[in-house]
Every structure is written in C-alpha cells, then in structure tokens.
C-alpha cells in the first residue's frame, strides 16, 4: 500500500527513512521547516494520487518548533478514505489529539515529553480495527497487533516489562490529573512560552517561526552574530543547559517550554542571558 508522508522537518524526514528501510512504497509532500503543512496541498496530493492508502505526518515538528494543523489534515485524509498515522511525540497530553474527533487511526508518543514521565517507554494509541486486524509487521519487536493480543485480556507484555518506567508513568499520570489535565498543562506550557519569548524579545532575540504556527512546546531563536559556544558555556555555568537547533542554514538555538518548569525559570534564564550579552563576550 502506498504511503503519503507529509513533512516539514527532521522528524518528518525520519519517517521517509523508516519507510525506505521497511520497503514501503511511498510519496512525499514537503514544506519548508518554518512553514506549517497546508491542508489544501494535502487534498490536492490525494486527488492527484488516488492510489495513496495511508497519510503520515508529525504533529509538533520540534525541528523548528511549529505545530501542524492536525485536525484539518486528518479530516481531509479521513474524508478521502485514507488511514491516518501521526507522530505526536511532543504534542500528546499538551494538545488535542482525539482519535475519534480528528479521524486518526493511530498515534505514537512517549512517556516523557508532555506527560513528564521517564523516556524509554513509547506507546501507540490506535483504533481496534487496526489492532485486531491482520499484522503486516516485518519486525517481531514492533508487531503491535501481536502485543495487543497479549495485553488484552491478560495485561501481559510479550517480553520482560519495563516495570520501573511503567511505575514512573503511573505517577506522572497521577500528577497530570492532579494538575488539572490537558487544559491546565496547556496553560502552564503557554505561560512558559510567553515568559520565554517576551524575555527574548526584550533582548532583541527573535524566533524564526511565524507566531500563527508557533507551538508552546519548543521555540527556535535566531542567534544572529552571537557565539553559541560562548553563550552555552555561560548559561551552563548559571545552571541552564540548552542545545543548538537542527536548522543548518541559520545560527539558531532551541529552548523547550515543557516539563516540570515554570515561568519564573524562564525569567531567570532571560536574566542570565541578558547579563551575558551585557558583558560584551
């Protein structure tokens, strides 16, 4: 079956590599890393290539920090009778990702990121139609249909279960509920993002993604002629560890606004950065 991979960043491009390694037939619809996926372009591609059976995309593309219009894209694909598979690694639990309401067949995410658990444990939320269907996996470990048959009704893993990570996830879910669930976490991450971008703006440092497409998960900033190595060393000495952006054509760096972090932390970060810039180094 032919896949349509819609990409606008490094993680969408990784899907292409995965499709190649799995020997899948695919076609690609690409956008600039600072431009959200255009639902109309997806519709046009589906009209031009009716043999496409499945549409794949990344919801929150952290290469640049933009959020793609998942509901609109999934709705178009579903209306055309396509299967919709989504990478929600950095959006699950912080953005709406309702399978039924959006028309998504399966999404993949992780216990860390917006759930604020530990990494290592990945999971898939999928329709019963897919999970109870015939497996087409070429990997024993990644055969989700087989794993599903073990989990229900007996609750078993096929292999040794990651007990420690599962317990950490359970605690993370308790804290998620205690905080107030999706709306409360969205509000905190948005407040983090606002504190960060406002502080950066005062320093003359701007983000590279247009505001209408910018997520509150991670933001990529244009460094201009600032030395990343020097800035990194100074911030690390002040207790902040950041990492460079994935964009190769610009001098950029990225800062995430998820995790057990609050606006006051970003205010302190911007204060430290201001001191570095004023030092003339």
Q: How does the language model describe each region?
A:
Residues 1-13:
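Conserved PLP-anchoring active-site segment centered on the Schiff-base-forming lysine
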Residues 37-93:
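Active-site phosphate-binding strand-loop segment of PLP-dependent enzymes
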Residues 100-112, 122:
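Conserved active-site segment immediately N-terminal to the catalytic lysine
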Residues 112-198:
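Active-site C-terminal subdomain of aminotransferase-like
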Residues 206-235:
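Conserved PLP-binding catalytic core of the aspartate aminotransferase-like
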Residues 238-254:
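Conserved PLP cofactor-binding pocket of PLP-dependent enzymes
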Residues 253-281:
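PLP-dependent enzyme catalytic core of the Aspartate aminotransferase-like
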């Amino acid at each position: 079956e032919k896949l349509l991979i819609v990409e606008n960043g490094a993680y969408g491009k990784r899907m292409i590599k995965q499709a190649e390694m799995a020997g899948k037939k695919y076609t690609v619809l690409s956008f600039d890393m600072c431009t959200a996926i255009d639902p109309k372009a997806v519709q046009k591609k589906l009209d031009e290539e009716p043999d496409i059976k499945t549409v794949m995309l990344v919801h929150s593309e952290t290469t640049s920090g933009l959020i793609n219009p998942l509901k609109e894209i999934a709705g178009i694909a579903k209306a055309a009778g396509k299967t919709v598979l989504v990478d929600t690694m950095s959006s699950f639990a912080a953005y709406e990702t309702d399978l039924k309401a959006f028309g998504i067949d399966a999404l993949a995410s992780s216990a860390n990121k917006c759930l604020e658990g530990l990494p290592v444990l990945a999971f898939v939320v999928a329709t019963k139609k897919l999970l109870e269907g015939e497996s087409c996996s070429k990997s024993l470990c990644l055969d989700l249909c087989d794993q599903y048959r073990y989990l229900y009704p007996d609750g078993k893993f096929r292999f040794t279960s990651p007990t420690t990570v599962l317990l950490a996830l359970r605690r993370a879910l308790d804290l998620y509920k205690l905080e107030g669930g999706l709306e409360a976490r969205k509000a905190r991450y948005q407040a983090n993002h606002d504190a960060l971008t406002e502080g950066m703006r005062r320093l003359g440092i701007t983000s590279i993604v247009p505001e209408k497409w910018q997520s509150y998960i991670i933001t990529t900033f244009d460094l201009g002629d600032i030395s990343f190595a020097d800035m990194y060393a100074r911030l690390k000495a002040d207790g902040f560890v950041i990492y460079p952006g994935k964009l190769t054509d610009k001098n950029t760096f990225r800062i995430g606004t998820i995790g057990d972090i609050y606006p006051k932390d970003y205010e302190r970060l911007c204060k430290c950065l201001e001191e570095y810039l004023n030092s003339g180094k």
